[in-house]
Amino acid sequence: MKRSKIIVLLLSVVLCLPGCGKKTDNAEMQQFLKQEGMQLQASGDYTGAIAKYEEALKLADMKVAAEEIDIAYYKASAQYRSGDLAGAIDTYSAILAVKENENSYLGRGLLYVAAKDAQKAEADLNKVLKETKNPLIQGIIYNAVNETQKAKECFEKAKKAEEADAIFYLANIYEKQGDHNYAMILLEEYIESGKANAEGYLSVGRHYFDAGAYEDALTLIRQGISLGESGVLKSLMQEEIACYEKLADFTSAREKAEAYLEKYPDDTLIQREYEFLKSR
């Protein structure tokens, strides 16, 4: 599992901007723009999505409401996924300037980790550690700053409290430590919990793929795709193509490559793969 993908999973985004009660027409247009942004984000067009979210947020007047916060969540997520760490950090700083809260300090602290700004990351994350009693949050913080043993202890405690995400984070730790077999056991447990996200399906699917169990891998990859989570959708679709190729189902592989290129037309690797598949 790549560290950047784990950071994506750790982030919880909240943003508030100044505003005052909005008119019904503005509310309807705001919702429309939000939906457009979500569709663009799901397709991997983060720049377009950010533009839609910003347009929607401009329709707010002088009072922050739940809808503005939700839109801003998507905006910050798109900023992070587009590689705009500075923009995502500014988003968190904006909410913290209005109202301090644990989630925003956590999110900004994790972004500082991703930006390799250890001093600022420590300041934000220590504020959360002093306040939170949640072992999952504690584990997330320790994991982010590479205090692996403390993270493992917190995740074990969270796992006992039936926090399903703790299983995934534990699997990540064991995998990084080279214990791939136990990591796989944990990932399977995570899938069986019924609370797995797309990243979990991708990770387990890749394990099965590497073991040569292509049918099982394909089943898990397709389940992950069905969740529609934009963060790993591109990787899931790539794995789906690879599974069909290994199963010698070149017709399905070609069809999936076509669908992939409709979403990600600039991927030269899959373009070359598609040309190969057309000859099979």
What are the language-model segments listed below?
Residues 16-19:
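C-terminal motif of bacterial Sec signal peptides marking the signal peptidase cleavage site
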Residues 31-32, 65-66, 70, 103, ...:
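Start-of-helix register in tetratricopeptide repeats
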Residues 35, 67-70, 74, 81, ...:
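Canonical tetratricopeptide repeat
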Residues 42-43, 81, 114-115, 144-145, ...:
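Register position in tetratricopeptide repeats
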Residues 61, 99-100, 129-133, 160-163, ...:
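Short coil turns that delineate tetratricopeptide repeat
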